[in-house]
Amino acid sequence: MTLQEQIMKALHVQPVIDPKVEIRKRIDFLKDYLKTTGAKGFVLGISGGQDSTLAGRLAQLAVAEVRNEGGNATFISVRLPYKVQKDEDDAQLALQFIQADQSVAFDIASTVDAFSNQYENLLDESLTDFNKGNVKARIRMVTQYAIGGQQGLLVIGTDHAAEAVTGFFTKFGDGGADLLPLTGLTKRQGRDLLQELGADERLYLKMPTADLLDEKPGQADETELGITYDQLDDYLEGKSVPADVAEKIEKRYKVSEHKRQVPASMFDDWWK
């Protein structure tokens, strides 16, 4: 088995999918996990990007089905901007599409800035822009877990195969969640599901960005990665990609393994 095949298997990627079937499977997963845990529903941060839009709509469909079947479940969507978000219109469009039971908004700027200032005062150095970006991601997850803890809700994560293979998420930030309904999907497959669900094309054709950096607001994921999503998707779907691209992907996969595992102990062997 080639490394490419090993990665596809490890990340549960299918080269070809039926969007209708995948939507059904992922809604059922959300419902089944909710029933098993006894939780009262879900909470998810909504950025206006493809991934949170898809996960949010799946979550709302799942809790609606639970209620229709006589159960009790709710979904809370959370806007978590840092000051003014450049693409706020897209976030509002996503919320209109998702139709969450409840939507709330937290501006994380005061919390992030207070921490950054305290760090500088205590350690006599400023956080790098990159590390401050990770603080933003982690504060967003702290907020979601606070809501989830108060309301008895599970926190949904938006990680999918194209992010997982590169480790393109913040450890214990957007990478910290209770369940991941988009696991196994490539970026283009996620677009296919949103299209099937009837989302406005603006929500799945927009340029993907983590938008965590103050110095480079709205920087494209592809710029930061040095790899396009089409290249990642081709690789993950078992297609041929240029050797240098495959090398980049495989290198990122290997060095980011710790981000896909629980904290290491001396009894684990994945890190050796």
Curated annotation (Swiss-Prot):
Any single GO BP term: NAD biosynthetic process
Documented EC number(s): 6.3.1.5
Reactions listed under catalytic activity: deamido-NAD(+) + NH4(+) + ATP = AMP + diphosphate + NAD(+) + H(+)
Annotated InterPro entries: NAD/GMP_synthase, NAD_synthase, NH(3)-dep_NAD(+)_synth, Rossmann-like_a/b/a_fold
Pathway membership, UniProt: Cofactor biosynthesis; NAD(+) biosynthesis; NAD(+) from deamido-NAD(+) (ammonia route): step 1/1
GO cellular component assignments: cytoplasm
Pfam entry (one): NAD_synthase
Keyword NAD in record: yes
Binding site for Mg(2+): 51, 163
Top-level taxon of origin: Bacteria
Keywords: ATP-binding, Ligase, Magnesium, Metal-binding, NAD, Nucleotide-binding
GO MF entries: ATP binding; glutaminase activity; metal ion binding; NAD+ synthase (glutamine-hydrolyzing) activity; NAD+ synthase activity
Family: Belongs to the NAD synthetase family.
Annotated HAMAP family: NadE_ammonia_dep
Subunit (UniProt): Homodimer.
Role noted for this protein: Catalyzes the ATP-dependent amidation of deamido-NAD to form NAD. Uses ammonia as a nitrogen source.
Descriptive protein name: NH(3)-dependent NAD(+) synthetase
Species: Bacillus mycoides (strain KBAB4)
Organism lineage: Bacteria, Bacillati, Bacillota, Bacilli, Bacillales
Protein encoded by which gene: nadE
